[in-house]
């Protein structure tokens, strides 16, 4: 089950070519998962911004289809039901889910990625420095 502020479950998805993608192997970059093709198209047009934010976006589907973003197949329906239509899942580089819900467009997805980037553990004072 996908939950906010929890690590993304260790699901295995497929590529259209038959390869397997184990979600924990995607650690190291912020992650965006979508199921809305129009949102995927809008986000793919802003690929340079995604790259600058160190993020990777994927379109999820149950069957192969043309996609403006890399396509991942959720054949077992493990993740697709968790994503709302027109919504997104945004996770940090450690795959902690920060957003799972509706978005008003690609700009809001990018805003979530900027927020996630600002949450890095190195960006805050160590606890000892608070006193």
PLM-predicted stretches and their roles:
Residues 1-131:
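Chalcogenol-based redox active-site neighborhoods
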